[in-house]
Amino acid sequence: MTNLRKTHPLMKIINHSFIDLPAPSNISAWWNFGSLLGACLIIQILTGFFLAMHYTSDTLTAFSSVAHICRDVNYGWLLRNLHANGASMFFMCLFLHVGRGIYYGSYLYKETWNIGVILLLTVMATAFVGYVLPWGQMSFWGATVITNLLSAIPYIGTTLAEWIWGGFAVDKATLTRFFAFHFILPFIITALAIVHLLFLHETGSNNPSGINPNSDKIPFHPYYTIKDALGLTLLFLTLLLLALFSPDSLGDPDNFSPANPLNTPPHIKPGWYFLFAYAILRSIPNKLGGVLALLASILILLIIPLLHTANQRSMMFRPISQTLFWILTANLITLTWIGGQPVEQPFIIIGQLASMLYFLLILVLMPLAGLFENYMLKPKW
């Protein structure tokens, strides 16, 4: 009798994707983040589903419903802490996954890469609307500041902002629709993730050397299922340590105060995972210019495949590009730090220089480094 996993219509798809999938024999732990992101998504959907059973999306009761979840619901405090810190773990894995893609040239699988960028934008949108739901001070003012950026769009800006708000300011209608968005978007993310995998399995995985691995492949199970299991264990352990011992360390103290439209916090800032983009937004004094820079900071990822000039795919054997990559990483950490600081000197100038360096590295220096490395590899005799 033929093995059921190879003949059953549904099992066959799972088999080709996770069991008999030919995978390069040399992929490192940097290739673990795909499965970790899948695990993060499942955790967020499950914890979010149970939280939604007790949450009320009304401006009068939203804040107290979150307090009720933490105090009165069985293990509600754990659900809330896992969900809030799960978002941080999700973004940490996302940033490392994107970084891996840039370092090893995975962006040359253009369809997979472009779907990945759309996924990143969708996850960011989901996290933003989710941050508003507890209806604390930072939730309300974060929503006000970020949605107000839409009004910078010429002609239609104000109308668009009011359309998103469902009124003339962030209020009950805004909270209700943000809850609806926050509930539906994870399912859209799941669908996009399946498409992402579909495109990846058309080409097969890249590997650290950047060389075609077809001559040396091994089955995904048991080799990489065991490897993924180790990664998942470390992810769950980190998440549990964070959620149980330091659940509020990545949040904002202002969010423990209920939203008050009459009292502006001294320093409005989003979640830590948005701070690099927020710093780029603030580094330009003009409102529309800032919004365009904010969009460009993420959408620039879409043109990275077009900026690849090197003859080698991976940065593994390209020391100049490696150096620039780690400067870019340090620069993004600097931007994240600046985004959390008040708008005063010397933070303003540091933010402006770091923002300029971010675009300079991606658009000019890294493509030039690729060309220079090609020249250095040419025989000179």
Curated annotation (Swiss-Prot):
InterPro entries reported in the protein's UniProt record: Cyt_b/b6_C (IPR005798), Cyt_b/b6_C_sf (IPR036150), Cyt_b/b6_N (IPR005797), Cytb/b6-like_sf (IPR027387), Cytochrome_b (IPR030689), Cytochrome_b_C_euk/bac (IPR048260), Cytochrome_b_N_euk/bac (IPR048259), Di-haem_cyt_TM (IPR016174)
Protein's membrane topology: Multi-pass membrane protein
Assigned keywords, A-Z: Electron transport, Heme, Iron, Membrane, Metal-binding, Mitochondrion, Mitochondrion inner membrane, Respiratory chain, Transmembrane, Transmembrane helix, Transport, Ubiquinone
GO biological process: mitochondrial electron transport, ubiquinol to cytochrome c
Transmembrane spans: 33-53, 77-98, 113-133, 178-198, 226-246, 288-308, 320-340, 347-367
Binding site for a ubiquinone: H201
Cofactor binding, per record: Binds 2 heme b groups non-covalently.
Cellular location(s): Mitochondrion inner membrane
SUPFAM superfamilies xrefs: a domain/subunit of cytochrome bc1 complex (Ubiquinol-cytochrome c reductase), Transmembrane di-heme cytochromes
Protein residues bound to heme b b562: H83, H182
Broad class of the protein's primary localization: mitochondrion
Pfam families noted in UniProt: Cytochrom_B_C, Cytochrome_B
Gene3D superfamilies (alphabetical): Cytochrome Bc1 Complex, Chain C (1.20.810.10)
Amino-acid positions noted as binding heme b b566 in the UniProt annotation, renumbered to this chain: H97, H196
Origin superkingdom: Eukaryota
Obligatory cofactor(s): heme b
GO cellular component terms, semicolon-separated: mitochondrial inner membrane; respiratory chain complex III
Family: Belongs to the cytochrome b family.
Functional description taken from the UniProt entry: Component of the ubiquinol-cytochrome c reductase complex (complex III or cytochrome b-c1 complex) that is part of the mitochondrial respiratory chain. The b-c1 complex mediates electron transfer from ubiquinol to cytochrome c. Contributes to the generation of a proton gradient across the mitochondrial membrane that is then used for ATP synthesis.
PANTHER family with a match to the protein in the record: CYTOCHROME B
Assembly and interaction partners: The cytochrome bc1 complex contains 11 subunits: 3 respiratory subunits (MT-CYB, CYC1 and UQCRFS1), 2 core proteins (UQCRC1 and UQCRC2) and 6 low-molecular weight proteins (UQCRH/QCR6, UQCRB/QCR7, UQCRQ/QCR8, UQCR10/QCR9, UQCR11/QCR10 and a cleavage product of UQCRFS1). This cytochrome bc1 complex then forms a dimer.
Note: Heme 1 (or BL or b562) is low-potential and absorbs at about 562 nm, and heme 2 (or BH or b566) is high-potential and absorbs at about 566 nm.
Name listed for the protein in its UniProt record: Cytochrome b
